[in-house]
Amino acid sequence: MREVSLEVRTGELVALIGANGAGKSTVLSAIAGVVKPVSGEIAFEGELLIGMAPEQIARRGIALVPEGRGIFPSLTVEENLRLGAYVRNNGSEYKRDVEEMSRRFPILGERLHQAGGTLSGGEQQQLAIARALMSHPKLLMLDEPSLGLAPVLVDQVFELIDGLHRSGVTILLVEQNVDRTLDIVDRAYLLNTGRIETEGAAGQLKRRVDIASVYMGGRG
């Protein structure tokens, strides 16, 4: 990774797009403190995050939904949700938050006592996102949320992300599904072989004839 500079403003839905191996997930992992950069700065609300442990970063309001969802299959839906609330240490709000997640994600509300591993792929993705929202994040980072899902479930995931954005959630989205991503985001950065190739408003990028070739690792 080199010369990667990006910004997400409050209330925005911003995408980081690019081919496999471009470094998209590495950027999210660095922001979350999972990967330690050897140089550069990462700042959130004016505070430098470099050197902080992942749990410290989470307590500052950054939540990461990793590629592959990362739910605990042997735990119930409610137990998975409870894990998402640990950074807040506010048991009095827990019940209200579960009710809110049940409203946002009705299928989860119906299956609170069901093991997470018995849910479908799309339902597990909903659970992973709901678990992250239990922390009341100021920034929600989603890493390849549509990966491995059937087309109908991909539609549901993008509708969910769009709905979260419209409700005021600030989101940094990593995705390979460029067309669908540019339909819902405010802005996007195109990452190519470890550096930002271009950036701009979603509408501008959709009109760029060379986006597909750069996305595939070439030059348009």
Short names for language-model regions:
Residues M1-G220:
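Glycine-rich phosphate-binding loops of nucleotide-dependent enzymes
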